[in-house]
């Protein structure tokens, strides 16, 4: 299957994001700089782009409430400063380029090294490809006692040629400079092992995976009041998608599959809850235009609070090519919506096949349409799957338990290091920092 590419950043959703975060996060004033006089352990959490703050909601606040002093680092942007304020943590802006840019990357590395040298944190957690690499190197050079690389996915899976090789080297170097590589799904860990990103002993998975779990009080079954506002008749079947509208998320295949669905179910509608992200896997102009003009496709743009939109859907589809662990699948499941997603890395972990949803191979529009039609034709099966999906989330992915595991694990890493067990070097990376 063909893959598409391009690069940049979307910012049109900022006001809505800030409004929703203020509703669902505890507000607190940002710290200009964590106090060195405090005995609390200091953790620096780094990401490349402030947009990634969307996946950190609750994580930073939980660490802070557990007794950590937290500093969030990313490229400059209002999302960085606002997220830090909402989570009650410090923030530092260091420009980092998403694309390969040797000179700019070196400058970013020096700035990260200076920051860590000044703050002297007990722990670092860097994620996303560029911040993960530069942060891991800077942390090693500064001798940070506990260095965590949080692997949220492998971009190299959908790349080829020289670029794939460069990304592989970057992942391997980030892992080599870290004590622990946390993976947010079992299949991602297995893929990292298969690709030789790191040794099996260094790659860790906490519990059943997921970065933050899901807020089951926010994402839950309930009445839907959005259909009229979205222009959807009350009784028509609605197929939904939530996320960035990009090629890596399988949008070209989904649009083709929807036309096949309409041939059988002409009353169906497709609800796309997301935005056109001008990233490396951006959609082409022709496909964008087709989506915007299609009479049965409803495009919301960026939505900060997606919870009520799941209640509009009869089936949620994520035809992705790669994931770490897709939050949107958990959110749909918690809302009692069956999901059709792929056997790709990460996404296969987010569904119990034939119980909470259906798994299909990536890249096949026919597989998408057939799976969706199976569910649309059988309301009772959809109901059973939805109930099973919510029960599965309640058993495995409630956010407070998922984040509690992270806090407990991080405290165990600090206990090992602060009590004098191998604070740096290969011995610490490979044997001292074992998971609980």
What are these regions (language model features)?
Residues 53-61, 237, 241-260, 366:
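A conserved mid-protein helix/loop that constitutes part of the nucleotide-sugar donor-binding site
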């Amino acid at each position: 299957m063909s893959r598409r590419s391009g690069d940049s950043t979307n910012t049109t959703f900022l006001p809505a994001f800030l409004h929703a975060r203020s509703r669902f996060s505890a507000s607190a004033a940002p710290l200009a700089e964590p106090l060195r006089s405090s005995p609390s352990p200091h953790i620096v959490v780094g990401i490349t782009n402030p947009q990634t703050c969307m996946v950190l909601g609750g994580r930073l606040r939980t660490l802070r409430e557990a007794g950590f002093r937290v500093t969030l680092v990313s490229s400059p942007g209002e999302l960085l400063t606002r997220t830090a304020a909402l989570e009650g943590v410090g923030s530092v802006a260091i420009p980092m380029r998403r694309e390969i840019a040797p000179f700019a990357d070196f400058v970013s590395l020096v700035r990260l090294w200076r920051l860590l040298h000044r703050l002297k944190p007990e722990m670092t957690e860097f994620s996303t490809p560029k911040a993960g690499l530069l942060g891991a190197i800077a942390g090693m050079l500064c001798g940070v006692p506990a260095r965590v690389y949080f692997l949220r996915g492998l971009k190299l899976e959908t790349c080829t040629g020289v670029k794939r090789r460069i990304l592989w080297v970057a992942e391997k170097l980030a892992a080599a400079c870290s004590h622990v590589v946390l993976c947010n799904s079992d299949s991602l860990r297995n893929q990292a092992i298969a690709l030789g990103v790191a040794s099996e002993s260094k790659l860790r998975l906490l519990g059943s995976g997921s970065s933050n779990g899901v807020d089951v009080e926010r994402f839950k079954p309930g009445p839907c009041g959005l259909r009229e506002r979205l222009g959807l008749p009350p009784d028509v079947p609605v197929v939904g998608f939530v996320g960035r509208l990009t090629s890596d998320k399988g949008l070209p295949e989904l649009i083709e599959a929807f036309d096949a669905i309409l041939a059988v179910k002409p009353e169906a509608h497709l609800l796309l809850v997301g935005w056109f992200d001008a990233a490396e896997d951006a959609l082409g102009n022709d496909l964008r235009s087709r989506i915007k003009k299609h009479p049965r496709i409803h495009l919301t743009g960026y939505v900060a609070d997606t919870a009520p939109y799941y209640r509009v859907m009869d089936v949620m589809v994520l035809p992705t090519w790669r994931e770490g662990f897709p939050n949107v699948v958990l959110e749909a499941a918690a809302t009692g919506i069956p999901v059709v997603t792929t056997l790709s890395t990460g996404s296969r972990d987010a569904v119990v096949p034939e119980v909470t949803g259906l798994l299909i191979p990536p890249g096949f529009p026919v597989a998408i349409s057939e799976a969706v039609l199976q569910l649309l034709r059988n309301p009772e099966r959809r109901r059973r799957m939805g109930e099973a999906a919510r029960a599965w989330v309640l058993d495995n992915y409630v956010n407070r338990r998922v984040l509690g595991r992270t806090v407990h694990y991080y405290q165990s890493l600090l206990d090992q290091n602060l009590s004098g067990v191998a604070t740096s070097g290969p011995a610490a990376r490979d044997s001292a920092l074992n998971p609980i």
